[in-house]
């Protein structure tokens, strides 16, 4: 049984369904147990297909109407009006639609999934916001594409899903320098336990800051850390620290009914 996390600011909207899905309720095994929705993983393709079908059914969408992207940690947002197969998914990091019954989604395993909706224009979006994409402007690109489809930013509600927490996100000096280059205000997203320690980066806070700067109507942030909650979430960083061969991807999706 699927039990996605829902954001209050989106679940209260008529005609919009969404979910930040956890790793539970699927058919995959091993490293991918159990709701791995990533076609780019080395999981059994039939398992990934069944997991994605379960998500689509939960949202009331047809199995072919769950749209994900070939994510590249960039700032490209695009609009879709009809089904796109997992094999033909376009390279982008945010997807927008105003087509009823078409569920737009992103895959994550530590990066921030962001779901957005303008209930009046009936335009929804899903964005994949890692630090690189967020710094490059993926949030701003998603909002701009929503506006091209008739949304107004002062009506847009946004929810940030489960992301790696600051306590688990240790970064090196080059990372810090890149984020501070030309924007000293980003310093507030870095924390050091002591003067000699490596900084820890607040990715969900950084994404929330970009959403706030975009002037949206409401922003909600989910607090669970993907790294620290192994029974609930996949985590790329955790898999790297354990030298595991691969990792699963959880999905976040939104649809206009």
Labelled PLM ranges:
Residues 1-257:
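Active-site microenvironment for binding and transforming phosphate-containing groups
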